[in-house]
Curated annotation (Swiss-Prot):
Descriptive protein name: Large ribosomal subunit protein bL19
Keywords associated with the record: Ribonucleoprotein, Ribosomal protein
Function statement: This protein is located at the 30S-50S ribosomal subunit interface and may play a role in the structure and function of the aminoacyl-tRNA binding site.
InterPro entries: Ribosomal_bL19 (IPR001857), Ribosomal_bL19_CS (IPR018257), Ribosomal_bL19_sf (IPR038657), Translation_prot_SH3-like_sf (IPR008991)
Family to which the UniProt record says this protein belongs: Belongs to the bacterial ribosomal protein bL19 family.
A cellular component term, taken from the record's GO annotations: cytosolic large ribosomal subunit
TM regions (residue ranges): none
Protein's organism: Yersinia pestis
SUPFAM superfamilies (UniProt xref): Translation proteins SH3-like domain
Gene: rplS
HAMAP family: Ribosomal_bL19 (MF_00402)
Lineage, highest ranks first: Bacteria, Pseudomonadati, Pseudomonadota, Gammaproteobacteria, Enterobacterales
Disulfide bonds: none
Keyword RNA-binding: no
GO biological process, one term: translation
GO molecular function: structural constituent of ribosome
């Protein structure tokens, strides 16, 4: 039974997900339905957490919008996500960057990872 579930989940998983880590700046393009219209909406920010669980994998992106911190959790293999683009690689030493929630301004900056 377990093999059947694994096979079905494998078919549902996206193959074109780029490699990104916490600290990376990414742009996620999401399909949004407003009434009868369907359009793409971009959400750009820093990845602060990644949850790797196969088909149920998710990642959290944080950005500052109008001086207010906004976090959004995306399911990695969701059909709602059109594309994920890595804009900038960040050099961090933690897996979860929840400490960025308390920081603003220059202290919330992340060094760029080279190479």
């Amino acid at each position: 039974m377990s093999n059947i579930i694994k096979q079905i989940e494998q078919e549902q998983m996206k193959q074109d997900v780029p490699a990104f880590r916490p600290g990376d700046s990414v742009e996620v393009k999401v399909w949004v339905v407003e009434g009868s219209k369907k359009r793409l909406q971009a959400f750009e920010g820093v990845v602060i957490a990644i949850r790797n669980r196969g088909l149920h994998s998710a990642f959290t992106v944080r950005k500052i919008s109008n001086g207010e911190g906004v976090e959004r959790v995306f399911q990695t293999h969701s059909p709602v996500i059109d594309s994920i683009t890595v804009k900038r690689r960040g050099a961090v030493r933690q897996a979860k960057l929840y400490y960025l929630r308390e920081r603003t301004g220059k202290s919330a900056r992340i060094k760029e990872r080279l190479g």
